[in-house]
């Protein structure tokens, strides 16, 4: 993993990518506790507690993308040709696999209720082959509860499409314009909250116009720019950086946890997911604080052990494949661990380790067995 301006590998970024990947798996391991009502209230508590801890995962990925790829040193056509197929083709392939699983449970004679365990956010499960084929046909356009995590790949392709244009502006190195953009982006992060406090349509939004004043500065592009800016190491003392990072993360977490917990009392995923996840939105001030805290501390980690460097490099190579397939294994692993009676936090931790180990091993095996085709299977 290298930057465009420096061929030296950034091992702290490899470590950060590993942390973000484990956070994604942990977040999805607690889906089963958050998506549906729990008989044990402690399961609900741990679902919210752990889920809130993991919200910076996707923003961290976006920040690393900006750090590593901006500014782009190739033509837009070359960038698109090299980057987009390695996301789009595996996304289509694995989405099809996910959509076939419910049908396969029916073929195997399993009860439909098992689908809800495997895919907690699919509230209308079906074992019909026709529904599976319909979902596969819609892959280029949308996703559903069977492929919850694939939303990120649609978003990532959008960032890739934007980056050549974004890069041309970033290369000008105009600090005033950069700071202004970030300020407007920060304003856009408050919109979900303002829509609940003031009115659902703000700054020109209405039935015939969904593009309000701050629309053009909103979304994950701000994380790209933030990662690019933070690529330059700051000379603040390490102790102060750690203190600042911890403070940012904890303050953001308090808002994220208390906000979600208060919403969970009033709403459910099936009734109003947009309200329930109001404080869990990735593009929100509180999650930015959490991501920024982790990023600043990770940036100061110096990894000198050749063995650890090699391990992190191998882990990074398999990270995209791990992301693609991890959701398949979470449900079965939790089903196997639940009868053991482990405390919920321990069950989640064990699930994360097992799922990551399985996915990493399978991805590494695909790279070894199919070296030429692997890039189109696991990225």
Per-region residue spans from a language model:
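Alpha-helical transmembrane segments and their immediate juxtamembrane cytosolic regions
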Residues: 1-379
